[in-house]
Structure formats: C-alpha cells, structure tokens
Design a protein with these regions (language model features):
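ABC ATP-binding cassette signature C-motif
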Residues: 1-5, 64, 68-288
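Extended, highly charged alpha-helical segments
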Residues: 1-61, 166, 260-288
C-alpha cells in the first residue's frame, strides 16, 4: 500500500503541472483568458507556498533537551501562598504545593484566575502577600514568558544564540528542530511573526541547560502541526516542567502527570476531561 503522503505528493504535482500549463497557454490571450491565467497563477502560488511549508516541517529533526545537572528532589516548594493585586480581591489563599523532580505539572483554571501570576511569583517578579516560595539551591530555571523578554528584538535569530557555544552548522541543525531553515536565522526578531518569536524563545530555553522549566502558554500563536512538534521535543525532557496551558492536544502529548486547579488549589492526577472543560470554557469567554 502506498503511503498517504506519497499519494498527496503525486496529486499535488499533477495539479501544479496543470496550473502551469493553463497559465502558459492563456497568459497572452484575450482579456478573459488573461484573467483566467491570473486566477490560476494565484492558485499556483498558494499551492507552492503550502508545499514549501510542508517540506519545511518534514525536515524537522528532533533535538534532545539536555540539563546541566539534576536538581534536588523538590526543586520548587510553595507554602501557604496568598496573593491578590489588592487585599480585598485575593486570587488565592494558603496555596501549597511541591514540584517533584522530573515531573510534568500543569496549572489550569479560568482566564484571569492567576495562572501567569503564579509563575511570576515563583520567578520573584511579584511578591506574595503571605507565605513563601522555596527554590532549592540546585534548581536552574528556564522561564518562557508570553512577553518573550529573553529575546533581543534588535538582533537576528542567529545573534540571539551567540553565547550558545554551537558552531554555525550545529546551530542551524538545532534551530531546524524548531522549524527554522536556511536563511531564517538571519531574520531580525522584530520582523518575525508572533509564532516565529514563540519558537525562538522556546529554542532559547531548550538550549539553556535548565533543569526546571516554567512555560506560560507556550502554544499561543503556533499552528496545530507546530504544537505537536514542540510537544514532541519537550516530552522527553528529563527535568521538571511547570506548564500553564489549556491546549488539550499539546498537554496530552507532553505527558502531564499532575495538575493544579486554580483558584481552589486542588491537586489531582492528570485528567484530560478537566483540561477540555477549561479549554472550552476559556474559548467561550474569549468570544464574548
């Protein structure tokens, strides 16, 4: 049996040749034929652009994310955290949980309930009203923020990895794991699409050697195929991972073990139905 990809490739090739033939035949004809040629030219350009994108993703080579050294058994511990932007409107009270070395831990809850805020508390960007956060001595954190603060937006992708220690060949191969190819690396960050910036930021974290990752909505701006590729890259990560996401397909492929529900503070084993509930709930809120 022929593979589906092979069949699609042959059909696309036939369509491409057909469009080229029509364009060549009609391009110098009367106005009606010239318009037909222009229409087919647009279809051909769309077909070729989609072909390039598929080829780009098919060239993906999986990269193993290494850690510099393991953390202690409890890399991060949150004890009786209470926080709110005003004391009259608290996001959570007496929130307590430990991260266990090597686990993938998910935070879920309605939009605006304080998921991103919790990561900022752990990173000491914000200060709790009460309680404490203990980061063990050997915990090396890689933090993916939605703002992409790690990136120098005036420099190229390649220049943002100038301290990586990789040769040009190694860097190109590594960035291929995040779907960057050929001359992509010479693009400045400030001209990249939101999805491309996300991939650069995730690549920076993957190369950092961190043994504990905090990922805040890492699939925002990524198309479904790219989300699966990123999940495939991070699922074999041997460190500890704390993720904020309601993207069911992404977290399901990531291999989440436990979940924290906000604002209740309830901790439970991974349940895809709970993630689906919040995914649908937040989609509905975003529409209104």
């Amino acid at each position: 049996m022929k593979k589906e990809g092979t069949l699609c490739s042959k059909e696309e090739k036939k369509e491409e040749e057909k469009l080229k033939e029509i364009i060549a035949r009609y391009i110098r004809g009367n106005e009606k034929k010239a318009n037909i040629a222009k229409d087919r030219q647009k279809k051909l350009e769309k077909l070729l652009s989609e072909k390039v994108e598929v080829e780009k993703k098919n060239k993906y080579t999986k990269f193993k994310i290494n850690i510099k050294y393991p953390s202690y058994s409890i890399p991060i511990s949150c004890n009786n955290l209470t926080f709110g932007y005003t004391e009259e409107n608290l996001l959570y009270q007496n929130l307590t949980f430990d991260l266990i070395r090597g686990e993938k831990f998910l935070i879920v809850g309605e939009n605006g309930i304080g998921k991103t805020t919790l990561l900022k508390l752990i990173m000491n960007i914000l200060t709790p009203l009460e309680g404490s956060i203990n980061i063990s001595e050997k915990t090396l954190i890689g933090y993916y923020a939605q703002e992409h603060d790690l990136l120098n937006k005036e420099k190229t992708i390649k220049e943002n990895f100038s301290d990586s220690g990789l040769t040009d060949y190694e860097l190109r191969r590594f960035l291929g794991s995040f779907l960057f190819t050929n001359d992509d690396i010479f693009k400045k960050i400030n001209i990249l699409s939101p999805g491309e910036r996300s991939r650069v930021a995730l690549a920076k974290i993957a190369l950092s050697g961190a043994n504990t990752l905090l990922l805040d909505e890492p699939t925002n701006h990524l198309d479904p195929m790219t989300q699966l590729i990123i999940a495939d890259t991070f699922k074999d990560y041997e460190g500890t991972m704390l993720v904020v996401s309601h993207n069911l397909e992404f977290v399901d492929n990531l291999g989440i073990e436990r979940m924290l529900l906000l604002p209740s503070g309830r901790i439970m084993y991974y349940d895809k139905n709970v993630v689906l509930h919040y995914e649908l709930l937040n989609e509905e809120v975003d529409k209104n």
